[in-house]
Amino acid sequence: MKTKAGFYDYSGNADDKTLSEILARLKASASAKKAPFSPQRLLLAMINEAALCIQEHIATPTDIDIAVLAGIGFPQSRGGILQYADEIGIDVILNQLNELCGVYGERFFPAPLIRRMVAAGFLGKKTKRGFLEHA
Protein backbone atom coordinates (compact mmCIF):
# COMPACT_ATOMS: atom_id res chain seq x y z
CA MET A 1 0.00 0.00 0.00
CA LYS A 2 1.37 3.38 -0.96
CA THR A 3 1.43 6.02 1.77
CA LYS A 4 2.31 8.86 -0.61
CA ALA A 5 4.95 9.97 1.91
CA GLY A 6 8.02 9.13 -0.12
CA PHE A 7 10.16 10.75 -2.76
CA TYR A 8 7.47 11.60 -5.29
CA ASP A 9 4.91 14.41 -5.08
CA TYR A 10 1.48 12.82 -5.43
CA SER A 11 -0.46 16.10 -5.21
CA GLY A 12 -1.39 15.88 -8.86
CA ASN A 13 0.37 19.17 -9.53
CA ALA A 14 2.45 18.58 -12.65
CA ASP A 15 4.62 21.65 -11.97
CA ASP A 16 6.90 20.89 -9.04
CA LYS A 17 8.33 24.29 -8.08
CA THR A 18 10.93 22.84 -5.71
CA LEU A 19 12.37 20.60 -8.41
CA SER A 20 12.29 23.45 -10.93
CA GLU A 21 14.19 25.70 -8.52
CA ILE A 22 16.84 23.04 -7.87
CA LEU A 23 17.31 22.38 -11.58
CA ALA A 24 17.60 26.11 -12.30
CA ARG A 25 20.29 26.49 -9.62
CA LEU A 26 22.22 23.50 -10.95
CA LYS A 27 22.11 24.84 -14.50
CA ALA A 28 23.38 28.22 -13.32
CA SER A 29 26.14 26.83 -11.10
CA ALA A 30 29.77 26.44 -12.12
CA SER A 31 29.52 22.70 -11.54
CA ALA A 32 27.16 22.41 -14.51
CA LYS A 33 30.02 22.89 -16.98
CA LYS A 34 29.72 21.06 -20.25
CA ALA A 35 32.29 18.32 -20.46
CA PRO A 36 32.82 15.35 -22.71
CA PHE A 37 31.71 11.96 -21.44
CA SER A 38 34.33 10.45 -19.14
CA PRO A 39 34.03 6.91 -17.77
CA GLN A 40 36.83 7.70 -15.31
CA ARG A 41 34.87 10.66 -13.93
CA LEU A 42 31.87 8.36 -13.36
CA LEU A 43 34.03 5.74 -11.65
CA LEU A 44 35.63 8.33 -9.38
CA ALA A 45 32.21 9.61 -8.33
CA MET A 46 31.12 6.03 -7.54
CA ILE A 47 34.31 5.30 -5.58
CA ASN A 48 33.84 8.52 -3.60
CA GLU A 49 30.20 7.67 -2.80
CA ALA A 50 31.22 4.13 -1.83
CA ALA A 51 33.78 5.58 0.59
CA LEU A 52 31.05 7.73 2.14
CA CYS A 53 28.84 4.63 2.55
CA ILE A 54 31.68 2.80 4.31
CA GLN A 55 32.47 5.82 6.48
CA GLU A 56 28.82 6.12 7.54
CA HIS A 57 28.56 2.34 8.23
CA ILE A 58 25.91 1.89 5.54
CA ALA A 59 27.79 -0.91 3.78
CA THR A 60 31.06 -2.82 3.90
CA PRO A 61 33.58 -2.77 1.05
CA THR A 62 32.57 -6.34 0.18
CA ASP A 63 28.87 -5.39 0.13
CA ILE A 64 29.63 -2.56 -2.28
CA ASP A 65 31.76 -4.67 -4.61
CA ILE A 66 29.10 -7.39 -4.77
CA ALA A 67 26.39 -4.78 -5.40
CA VAL A 68 28.22 -3.19 -8.35
CA LEU A 69 29.04 -6.58 -9.83
CA ALA A 70 25.46 -7.83 -9.57
CA GLY A 71 23.58 -4.56 -9.81
CA ILE A 72 25.23 -2.45 -12.50
CA GLY A 73 27.24 -5.06 -14.34
CA PHE A 74 30.68 -3.85 -13.27
CA PRO A 75 33.24 -6.14 -14.96
CA GLN A 76 33.84 -9.26 -12.87
CA SER A 77 37.46 -9.25 -13.98
CA ARG A 78 37.90 -6.03 -11.97
CA GLY A 79 36.46 -7.61 -8.82
CA GLY A 80 34.27 -4.62 -7.95
CA ILE A 81 34.67 -0.88 -7.78
CA LEU A 82 36.69 -0.86 -4.56
CA GLN A 83 38.96 -3.64 -5.80
CA TYR A 84 39.47 -1.43 -8.87
CA ALA A 85 40.23 1.57 -6.65
CA ASP A 86 42.82 -0.47 -4.76
CA GLU A 87 44.47 -1.46 -8.06
CA ILE A 88 44.71 2.17 -9.19
CA GLY A 89 45.90 3.34 -5.79
CA ILE A 90 43.96 5.31 -3.18
CA ASP A 91 46.51 8.13 -3.43
CA VAL A 92 45.88 8.34 -7.18
CA ILE A 93 42.11 8.35 -6.55
CA LEU A 94 42.54 11.20 -4.06
CA ASN A 95 44.63 13.24 -6.51
CA GLN A 96 42.12 12.72 -9.31
CA LEU A 97 39.18 13.66 -7.07
CA ASN A 98 41.00 16.82 -5.98
CA GLU A 99 41.54 17.75 -9.64
CA LEU A 100 37.88 17.13 -10.49
CA CYS A 101 36.78 19.08 -7.42
CA GLY A 102 38.76 22.06 -8.69
CA VAL A 103 37.07 21.85 -12.10
CA TYR A 104 33.52 20.68 -11.29
CA GLY A 105 33.00 21.77 -7.71
CA GLU A 106 32.16 20.15 -4.42
CA ARG A 107 30.35 17.14 -5.83
CA PHE A 108 33.85 15.68 -6.32
CA PHE A 109 35.14 16.71 -2.88
CA PRO A 110 37.01 13.61 -1.66
CA ALA A 111 35.35 11.65 1.14
CA PRO A 112 37.13 12.10 4.48
CA LEU A 113 37.75 8.33 4.59
CA ILE A 114 39.81 8.55 1.39
CA ARG A 115 41.90 11.37 2.86
CA ARG A 116 42.45 9.41 6.09
CA MET A 117 43.42 6.26 4.20
CA VAL A 118 46.09 8.10 2.22
CA ALA A 119 47.41 9.83 5.36
CA ALA A 120 47.64 6.42 7.09
CA GLY A 121 49.45 4.84 4.14
CA PHE A 122 46.56 2.57 3.08
CA LEU A 123 47.11 3.05 -0.65
CA GLY A 124 45.66 -0.17 -2.04
CA LYS A 125 47.45 -3.15 -3.56
CA LYS A 126 50.86 -1.45 -3.58
CA THR A 127 50.79 -1.33 0.24
CA LYS A 128 48.67 -4.50 0.60
CA ARG A 129 46.02 -2.46 2.42
CA GLY A 130 43.32 -0.25 0.97
CA PHE A 131 39.57 -0.64 0.99
CA LEU A 132 40.37 -4.37 1.09
CA GLU A 133 43.36 -6.32 2.39
CA HIS A 134 45.66 -7.83 -0.23
CA ALA A 135 48.09 -10.73 0.24
Across the structure, where does each feature detected by a protein language model lie?
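N-terminal glycine-rich phosphate-binding loop for ADP-containing cofactors
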Residues: M1-A135
